[in-house]
């Protein structure tokens, strides 16, 4: 098992997948020789993993009245590893939340479409304030830099990187 860790039956995990990169799974049994898991894609089938295959713990999905709960900041994730980060970004992307914090850094995903209301005047006004917002948005990043100049007389830098 990864790092000689033992896993209990029912443990929610991520396993490598050829097409999807990572796939959600649940441990059926685990011992020193093999780990048997089941997945939503193959509920009747079982996948047998070698003990040295990469496995990452997964948190139970949280649902609210609006649907799947998606964290505004990746540092709030219970497990901070590649599959958890990619899943969180995908879940946010699926509901048109293209901005996500990772600590003080803003991650922006290309939505490949127009998202109505994303840059409206009302949205802009909601970020123009002396109080910092906790919502991830490019307007928030701009306002924080502006406030740093005006309130603290400190030089500010906004680094933009992408393809």
Please name every model-derived segment.
Residues 1-161:
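N-terminal entry segment of cytoskeletal motor ATPase domains
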